[in-house]
Structures are given as structure tokens and as C-alpha cells.
């Protein structure tokens, strides 16, 4: 049997609050259309996608909005704009599915993480999600705390 390869992708940015603030539905993997300095800046791991979202334009294209990829320090006059809208690359059928999902009440497209795959390409994991209300967030917190407590009790009793 061949030795099992471990995960080869490197996470550049992660939206950890998304799973707390939203009920995550279907997830998609999309490519990112980036400039050279954006790729180099992403590799430093200082990008922020916590306040970002994706939207489908009338032309049938999907854009990542409000994501911050800081300027690359070694690039001088050829640097990029940190908060520009970035095009996401998906199949047309997937874009149609996302557009139909956002037309439903309360659904939005949320980025979960940006990573580099095993071929060195920048990819983004996006999800169709519905925003949680305050009581749902409290319920999630209670369940997580109870699961932790159960784990502690099971370890103590052995």
C-alpha cells in the first residue's frame, strides 16, 4: 500500500466567524483571478476575508467583494489595490445555482477560506449560507459547551 499523502494545500486566509454567524449550506470551490503581487501577498498569510461576501453580477459573473489582500511590500509602483473586487472562476451551472440560491430569502454567498492547492493555484471555498439569529447563536454555543463538558467527563471516568 502506498504511503498516504497528507493535505498539501496551505490556507492563506480563513473566515472562522462564518460558521458561527451563518448556517452553512452547499459549498463550492472557485478559482481566483489575481495579479502577481496579490498572489505573493496571499502567500504571506495576511489576507482578511471576515467582512467579505460574493455577489453575482448581471453579466453572469461572480465577484468577491470587500476582501482585503494587503499590498506586497517588495513591489514598488506595480502594486495592487487592497480592496478591489476580484472575479471568481466557476462553471456557469454553478454560478446559476448560486444566483438562484441568493434570490431566496436570507441566503448569501460567504467565503470560508482561501488556500493554495497542491498545484500552487489560489482557490477559495465559498458557501451558500443563511444568517443565524441571536437565539440560534446562543443555542450553538450551549451545544458546543455541552459537548466539551461531555468530553471532559468521559476522560475523567475513563
Swiss-Prot record:
One of its GO terms (biological process) is trans-translation. Gene3D superfamilies: 2.40.280.10. GO terms for cellular component: cytosol. InterPro entries: SmpB (IPR023620), SsrA-bd_prot (IPR000037), SsrA-bd_prot_CS (IPR020081). GO terms for molecular function: RNA binding. It is found in: Cytoplasm. The keyword Magnesium does not apply. The keyword Protease does not apply. Residues 133-158 are annotated as: Disordered. CDD domains: SmpB. Keywords: Cytoplasm, RNA-binding. Belongs to the SmpB family. PANTHER family: SSRA-BINDING PROTEIN, TMRNA-BINDING COMPONENT OF TRANS-TRANSLATION TAGGING COMPLEX. NCBIfam families: PRK05422.1, smpB. Required for rescue of stalled ribosomes mediated by trans-translation. Binds to transfer-messenger RNA (tmRNA), required for stable association of tmRNA with ribosomes. tmRNA and SmpB together mimic tRNA shape, replacing the anticodon stem-loop with SmpB. tmRNA is encoded by the ssrA gene; the 2 termini fold to resemble tRNA(Ala) and it encodes a 'tag peptide', a short internal open reading frame. During trans-translation Ala-aminoacylated tmRNA acts like a tRNA, entering the A-site of stalled ribosomes, displacing the stalled mRNA. This is SsrA-binding protein. It comes from Methylocella silvestris (strain DSM 15510 / CIP 108128 / LMG 27833 / NCIMB 13906 / BL2).
